């Protein structure tokens, strides 16, 4: 687990400030350098006309506490900024008269559009937060760091549990004939690099120096290449991650008990 010595003094000062003041107080003009970078880098008019891929971006509706998923034709600069709006750093982003925060609170990422609105069987998840850590955090900042990771992973785990449930319904042929065409056995793939990510603290998310960013890019590409070398042939054929073994535990037991009951009755 990253130590306090790995965190720059500027992070501690900024963290302390955000606990005392809101962005409406310390950043009244809502200055966000990322907004300028996105505006200069992405042609949103061209993006909205794209019909070769489906892009889904989620944001949290502040008033209702519900997730809103924006589709390709709806995406503009405000949508992108809303999806990354951490409320202790930036003012809520207003879209069509409604305020939004970071989508990660309810979907990190939101998976359901990928199997409700696409025909592909393969679902690939690229993790940017470590799922597990070997040590129990002891310092205040280590504890907050781990809480941050668990909070943002919780929505993903809930969706993975739902996917695992449907996969078991299909596997054990528990769907009525009239509903079988409405569900398919999603093939789940998980790209993780916990050995790299566990060395980084929440403070690393505030680092913007070029060397750090390019280093993370290179490590990400190396991780993806390694995954493809090992698993490319599995795409479209079978899962490459054990949902129950890596993320869940109770769902399998429920279905195994169900199968045992049926076996007992049949005998």
Q: What are these model-predicted stretches?
A:
Residues 1-267:
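Patatin-like phospholipase
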């Amino acid at each position: 687990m990253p130590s306090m010595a790995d965190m720059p003094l500027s992070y501690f000062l900024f963290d302390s400030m955000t606990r005392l003041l809101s962005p409406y107080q310390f950043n009244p003009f809502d200055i966000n350098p990322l907004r300028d970078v996105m505006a200069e880098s992405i042609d949103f008019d061209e993006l909205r006309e794209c019909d070769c891929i489906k892009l889904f971006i989620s944001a949290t509706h502040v008033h209702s506490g519900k997730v809103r998923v924006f589709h390709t034709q709806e995406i503009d600069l405000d949508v992108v900024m809303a999806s990354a709006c951490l409320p202790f750093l930036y003012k809520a982003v207003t879209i069509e008269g409604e305020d939004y925060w970071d989508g990660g609170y309810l979907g990190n990422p939101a998976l359901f559009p990928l199997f409700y609105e696409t025909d592909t069987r393969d679902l690939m998840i690229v993790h940017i937060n470590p799922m597990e850590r070997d040590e129990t955090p002891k310092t205040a900042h280590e504890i907050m760091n781990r809480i941050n990771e668990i909070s943002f992973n919780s929505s993903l785990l809930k969706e993975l549990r739902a996917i695992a449930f449907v996969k078991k319904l299909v596997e054990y042929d528990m769907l009525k004939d009239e509903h079988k065409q409405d569900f398919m056995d999603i093939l789940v793939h998980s790209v993780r690099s916990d050995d790299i990510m566990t060395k980084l603290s929440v403070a690393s998310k505030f680092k913007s120096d070029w060397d750090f960013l390019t280093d993370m890019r290179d490590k990400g590409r190396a991780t993806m290449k390694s995954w493809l070398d090992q698993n490319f042939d599995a795409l479209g054929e079978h899962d490459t991650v054990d949902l129950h073994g890596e993320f869940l535990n109770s769902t399998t037991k429920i279905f195994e008990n169900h199968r045992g009951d049926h076996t007992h009755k049949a005998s």
